[in-house]
Amino acid sequence: MPFSRLFGKKEKNQMDDIVEEGVQRVQELPMDKIFPNQFQPRTVFDQDKIDELARTIRIHGVIQPIVVREMEPDYYEIIAGERRFRAVLSLEMEKIPAIIQNLDDEEVAAIALIENLQREELTPIEEAKAYRSLLDMQDVTQEALAQRVGKSQSAIANKMRLLKLPETVQEAVLNKQISERHARSLLALETEEQQVAILAEIAENHWNVKQTEARIQEILGVKKPVATKKTKPKRQAISRDVRIAMNTIKQSVTMVKDNGMDLDFTEEETDDFYQITIQIPKKK
């Protein structure tokens, strides 16, 4: 089964095809002759789930065989079913039912990735490394890979950007100490030293993503714009106020004169001020 044919199939049929092709070759293989998939994208296994699976196997047996390929005479590598293998191993069973397939490295890597993606059990770092592995092994573009695994090209590109982070940060994502969004925010920092330092601050202060982004903006010197009220030119405002004051005074003087009082009103304008003089006689 060439790699191109494998990637040309609908994901939901890939594992079924493997089982159908090998249904006549189910064998009971010794546990000590089987080793894990070298292309297994998942590096962290939930022990509680494996223990739960082991309890089911203890009662009902292994219902679905694992899939392996023969690497050397009587030595087999797991293609699919490592959780079942680990559960059986914990039960100290000597043999496990298996389907033997003849697949090359590219096909094995593709199956391992697709199987885990379908179950949504990979961490963002595991997923990113699996994409990189497939791209490195086969002359396939991100766009073609995206179509085959049912993801957008941008989703694959964004996942792979996480691999630019220092190993310490990647480990934190892998172990679920920080979220993928935390990790993405760290990509804005210029140096690995800054990224590792902020990782420590996240752990110490239990920052959420928004708090982390605010701290990163502070480091980068990005200041939040402050909204300011629009003000008219100061000179224009002062001129308007002076005119109002002058008109008010003149209107008052006019009212006094209209009431029969004889008074003198003079005004003088200088560079710095207006001078108003009002003379009111004490006697008529």
UniProtKB/Swiss-Prot annotation:
InterPro entries: Chromosome_partition/occlusion (IPR050336), HTH_ParB/Spo0J (IPR041468), Nucleoid_occlusion_protein (IPR023705), ParB/RepB/Spo0J (IPR004437), ParB/Sulfiredoxin_dom (IPR003115), ParB/Sulfiredoxin_sf (IPR036086). One of its GO terms (molecular function) is DNA binding. One of its GO terms (cellular component) is cytoplasm. SUPFAM superfamilies: KorB DNA-binding domain-like, ParB/Sulfiredoxin. HAMAP family: ParB_Noc. Belongs to the ParB family. Effects nucleoid occlusion by binding relatively nonspecifically to DNA and preventing the assembly of the division machinery in the vicinity of the nucleoid, especially under conditions that disturb the cell cycle. It helps to coordinate cell division and chromosome segregation by preventing the formation of the Z ring through the nucleoid, which would cause chromosome breakage. This is Nucleoid occlusion protein. It comes from Listeria monocytogenes serotype 4b (strain CLIP80459). The gene is noc.
